Amino acid sequence: MSNYTPHNKTSDNQKSNREKLYSLYNESPLPLEEMLINTGLYTRSSALSKFFFLGEIYQKIINIPGNIHVFGTWWGQDVVLLHNLRAIFEPYNFTRKVVGFDTFTGYPDLSEKDTVSDTLKEGAYTTSANYIDHLQALLDYHEKENIMSHINKFELVEGDILRTLPAYCEKNKHELISLIYIDVALYDPTKAIIENCIPHLVKGSIIVFDELNAKEYPGETIALKESGLLNTCTVERSKFLPDRTILVYNG
């Protein structure tokens, strides 16, 4: 059982209806190999919109050089999907790597600028024991399934961003970043991401916030406003997920 309440706007009726979907999925008559190519049968429209959203932001960076950084990977779906979108939109671009950052043990702590709740608390969004190994294996599989599989185009960075990100940037001074996806909800890691990653952006790079302008999760917005980054970016919202905010860096 999870030790937190995932943030969503789901009604009680929707929650009840989803129990039916879970049963249909668990009791599916489809063979496993057919399940894997017919996942749309069990994909809700709200979940499908996330796929369209990731395609939306990826298409904004196709002509922008640099890697993709995902902060707050959790189970890693965004990392896998962005990795496969690279294979779809630019299969021969071996220079673009998808890098995922997470503790894989949940939030280490919160600052006074964050709002503690059943969703935001120490240990929330933890994964199963050794889950990073499973995610690594999944990414290895997708790498081998796609073109130019002999060149590694993904990386997972485990640990607290406050420590791992400065070390990563020091080790990768050559790096440009085309897309930053911030899904950490908290003040301190958001501040660290902005401070460490901005020097690696180029004009046209994209910064995506998952919980901007959200009263329940003030940390991301406070860190962004304090940084002054809003003065150097064009701001828009996603066409598919209205609570996702897209910043286009103008340098």
Regions picked out by a protein language model, each given a short descriptive name:
Residues 1-19:
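N-terminal auxiliary segments of SAM/dcSAM-dependent transferases
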Residues 15-39, 45, 62, 67-251:
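S-adenosylmethionine/decaboxylated-SAM
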Residues 47, 51-54, 79:
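Short alpha-helical patches at coil-to-helix transitions and adjacent helical residues
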Residues 53-63:
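Conserved alpha-helix/loop element of class I SAM-dependent methyltransferases that forms part
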